[in-house]
Amino acid sequence: MAENNNEEILLLKKEVNYAVKLLKNGQINEALKIVEALIKKSPNVPLLYNIRGVCYQTIRELGNAIDDFSQATILKSDYAEAYCNLGVTYQEKGDLVSAVNAYKNAIDNDNNYPTAHNNLGKIFLASGEIDSSIEHLECAITLKSDFADAHNNLGSAFLRINKLNDAIKSYKKAIALKPDFAVANNNLGIAYLRTGNPKLASKFFENAITITPGYATAHHNLSGVKVYKEKDKQLNLIESLLIENNLSQKERIYLNFALAKAYEDLGNHEELFKHLNEGNRIRKKEMSNSIADSEEHNELIKLFFNSNNIKLTYRDSLPIRPIFIVGMPRSGTSLVEQIISSHHEVYGAGEVNNFHNIIMPIIEKHAVNENYNLKNDEFALIRKQYSNSLERFYANEKVITDKWILNFKTIGFILSAFPESKIVHLKRDARATCWSIYKHYFSDEGNRWAYDYQDLARFYKSYLGLMDYWHNLFPGKIYDISYEDLTSNQEKETRNLLKYCDLDWDENCLNFYTNTRAVKTASAVQVRNKMYQGSSDVWRQYSEYLKPLLDALK
């Protein structure tokens, strides 16, 4: 900073400190007036633009905030704090590319800036760049060991790659540093749920709600692990929250789904469907794509495959052989993965969207040019990229399961790139499957068709059509297993399943409920219990309310 700027700051120090005090006290307009007057007197002082930027950021005038933080960095090119504030503002605006660049500039000018490392790690976490996320979050903690938010974010990064013990340790550290950290309590509950401990999960969801009674996500999570009884205090709390006008749409979705679960437990069908329909209605409004887009995409995929362009020969051997478990959500895929991954030679990776993320850009590129023939080297690249993506699981087993169920869309690409892979397809009664889908909230944006009876039925039929297509194109390559048969003839179906997967018999596969691996899906509790029958008939008691869905499925 130039000497005259330093002198100006010294002269204006009293007024600057007063403006900062007002800002910290929440008196934003008063602080703005003082800073604007100071900028008119001293237009080349970067600190003033940074302070005014924080004022604008606080009152959500993000465009003005970006202008001021940018001006501060122009006047002082090594101004790490202004770059970091600029990153926060871009992040709040949804411009993550610009946010990443701003945080990197902050770190380039001050590598010992824990906030910048934490914020950058959080973006990498959201984008699925887990290794980079962990690197920056650990750096933030090294620089500031009592950084509760960084410990919480690191826990979430570990959770993404199924390192549950590390995740739990990080969340506990965050809570120890900040006992009233509601988000960390909720996240610790999620981690315990994935280990198969609903009792501990419930405790931390309840802690989160005690700290923040309006925490909609925690209410929804708690609803999934408890059985409600009459006069439950949580019911009254959620009902009162829904009356408030300042709730976000996302919060209303979580609370309606939570109430629906509660009224399902209580046997109040009318209230169950009142809240279930409302939650689904709001959730559908959030979705940008229509069911027609999903149907068209399924038809588009078929164009890439015919008897002339399927190549199934590779000379290289894979370090670990994949088993892809596919089907509709809520069809029993989590149960089957739990069974297979109980085998001593199998690592259960859970829902891995790696193949989807690799193949979709390739599909889009070819579709734009109406070129539906993939070259051998493209399949070889897909094979290499997906194989490399599995390395982050550090699995020592010979076989790995991938339960990204919507991989049913890309079976042709999977078998072309991995002819040695196994495809296990779950089949379940359509009515049971669709009812179970409709009553569950999916955080994944890919299930845009799940929140409306007609959309759900249309997608189900499109799914059946695509599976028929793959069966005809790859006869004998896809193993169908019926959920109903599996639950009624457990040992017979398990033996047949393992035989198809080229796995020797392992008694542990019958005792799948003792498997302690992480389970990320809504079935995390169910797969810890012994197999039970009858779940495919539960929809019948709601047939009066489900008539539009049942008619659409015919």
Could you describe each region identified by the protein language model?
Residues M1-K14, I238, N246-S248:
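TPR-adjacent "capping" and linker segments in tetratricopeptide-repeat scaffold/adaptor proteins
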Residues I414-I437:
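Conserved phosphate-donor/acceptor-positioning beta-strand/loop module used by diverse small-molecule
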